């Protein structure tokens, strides 16, 4: 979480964690691939860690995102993703490829239909 001054709030609440046990992921082509948990480099074994951020709650307040004018806007919080390089296994062949991970929590808004009766 970013540090906020008194009186400042996030529109959406997020939680960030280091993920060390990821075994599968989606690559850039949309294929599910096997992520190697342990990586052997020069006879040393390393774990792959991924820093992931996701939304705590899609609706931090009953109307959706915090601070959005619910009279004119529909809103909800959603997790977005990005691609990072990871050592993966495909058909007994290890290779570096980009995999999708959770990276942020953002607010999505859409205008409500105004009814002028």
From Swiss-Prot:
It is found in: Secreted. GO terms for biological process: cell surface receptor protein tyrosine kinase signaling pathway; modulation of chemical synaptic transmission; negative regulation of neuron apoptotic process; nerve development; nerve growth factor signaling pathway; neuron projection morphogenesis. Keywords: Disulfide bond, Glycoprotein, Growth factor, Lipid-binding, Metalloenzyme inhibitor, Metalloprotease inhibitor, Protease inhibitor, Secreted, Toxin. Belongs to the NGF-beta family. The lineage of its organism: Eukaryota, Metazoa, Chordata, Craniata, Vertebrata. One of its GO terms (molecular function) is metalloendopeptidase inhibitor activity. Homodimer; non-covalently linked. This is Venom nerve growth factor. Glycans are attached at residue 21. Pfam families: NGF. Disulfide bonds join 12-77, 55-105, 65-107. It comes from the Eukaryota. Nerve growth factor is important for the development and maintenance of the sympathetic and sensory nervous systems. It stimulates division and differentiation of sympathetic and embryonic sensory neurons as well as basal forebrain cholinergic neurons in the brain. Its relevance in the snake venom is not clear. However, it has been shown to inhibit metalloproteinase-dependent proteolysis of platelet glycoprotein Ib alpha, suggesting a metalloproteinase inhibition to prevent metalloprotease autodigestion and/or protection against prey proteases. PROSITE patterns: NGF_1, NGF_2. One of its GO terms (cellular component) is synaptic vesicle.
